[in-house]
């Protein structure tokens, strides 16, 4: 599905005075005072004439508008260019960076339940590079439990939308959950979105390294970490499709009680996932897997896993697996799934397997494991 017309986008870009300016040359800042300028270059926000974002400042302005209460519910956005947020910086796999000075901190689009992005966002196969986050944005929310929460990524908190055709590259999200004066904070982190509720996600790629850590290993609540999305909640009456999504970044955490996945940390609700893969190394604690750390499903007919592949090495001290670490509920089937990475659990008692740590309900068809499994079994442990 594409919700834009190529001709309209091309015409909008031709008319834009910024279209010929290299994106890396456009400076940006997150607004600190009320602004009047629009967070897009052209468009009407409709499916046939979407809002077109062409530079980093417009993307930052969109974040400001959403975080001050505008949801853009039902509107359509597209990218008209690759967007570079920190030109001149290179972000390394070891969590360091190279460049002059310090990179600019990205403020996520949608900070929580009261500041939610509800529009459709199509990257049109463009890249967003240079996302850098090392400090949490903390709000008081009720999901997944009442208390202090932080939603980090390009988007923080999104709902009832579509995120598609976006690649996150040359970026670094490395967060410390210890904040002075806050005893307990629950964190949802993904390079694309921290939390995506009732949202369709397809053709999205993460190449960034994403991690959450603690200096003291205390003060951090139940958290969700994914290469693309930290956690997704899906209403009981719905089912969403996730397809053609891939991760190559290293995803890691030392926090206790964290669900970690190469694509999604946690999915709560019915979904179908197809044609997705992970090629990054995953290091977690409680639940860790190549694609999804944990799922909670309701209606078996609305669920399914097809054509999934893990190539990364998975390490954890709880339930660990190449595809899915733990499933609460039922999944109708898993078809054509393969794990080629090594799976290691350091826990004495855990559900760990080459493909699935825990798989309840349906059929496993034409799935196989080619990686070494330490602390579990070949395809499914339980």
Range-by-range predicted roles:
Residues 1-26:
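Sec-dependent, cleavable N-terminal signal peptides
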Residues 24-382:
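Surface-exposed repetitive/solenoidal architectures
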């Amino acid at each position: 599905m594409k919700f834009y017309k190529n001709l309209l986008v091309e015409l909008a870009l031709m008319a834009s005075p910024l279209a010929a300016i290299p994106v890396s040359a456009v400076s940006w800042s997150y607004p600190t005072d009320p602004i009047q300028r629009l967070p897009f270059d052209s468009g009407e926000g409709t499916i046939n004439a979407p809002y077109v974002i062409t530079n980093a400042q417009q993307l930052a302005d969109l974040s400001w508008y959403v975080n001050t209460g505008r949801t853009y519910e039902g509107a359509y956005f597209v990218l008209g260019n690759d967007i570079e947020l920190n030109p001149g910086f290179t972000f390394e796999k070891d969590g360091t960076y190279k460049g002059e000075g310090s990179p600019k901190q990205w403020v996520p689009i949608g900070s929580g339940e009261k500041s939610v992005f509800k529009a459709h966002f199509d990257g049109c196969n463009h890249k967003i590079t240079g996302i850098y986050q090392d400090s949490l944005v903390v709000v008081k929310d009720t999901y997944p439990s009442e208390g202090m929460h932080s939603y980090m990524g390009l988007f923080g908190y999104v709902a009832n939308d579509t995120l598609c055709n976006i690649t996150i590259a040359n970026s670094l999200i490395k967060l410390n959950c210890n904040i002075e004066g806050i005893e307990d904070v629950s964190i949802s982190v993904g390079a694309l979105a921290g939390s995506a509720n009732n949202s369709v996600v397809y053709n999205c790629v993460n190449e960034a390294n994403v991690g959450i850590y603690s200096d003291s290993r205390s003060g951090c609540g139940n958290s969700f970490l994914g290469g693309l999305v930290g956690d997704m909640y899906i209403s009981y009456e719905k089912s969403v499709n996730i397809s053609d999504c891939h991760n190559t970044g290293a995803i890691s955490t030392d926090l206790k009680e964290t669900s970690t996945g190469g694509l999604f940390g946690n999915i709560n609700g019915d979904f179908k996932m197809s044609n997705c893969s992970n090629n990054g190394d995953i290091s977690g604690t409680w639940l860790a897997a190549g694609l999804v750390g944990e799922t909670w499903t309701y209606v078996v007919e609305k669920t399914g896993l097809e054509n999934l592949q893990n190539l990364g090495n998975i390490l954890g001290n709880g339930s660990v697996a190449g595809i899915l670490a733990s499933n609460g509920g039922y999944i109708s089937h898993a078809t054509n799934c393969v794990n080629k990475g090594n799976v290691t659990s350091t826990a004495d008692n855990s559900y760990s397997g080459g493909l699935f740590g825990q798989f309840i309900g349906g059929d496993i068809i034409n799935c196989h494991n080619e990686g070494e499994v330490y602390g579990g079994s070949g395809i499914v442990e339980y």
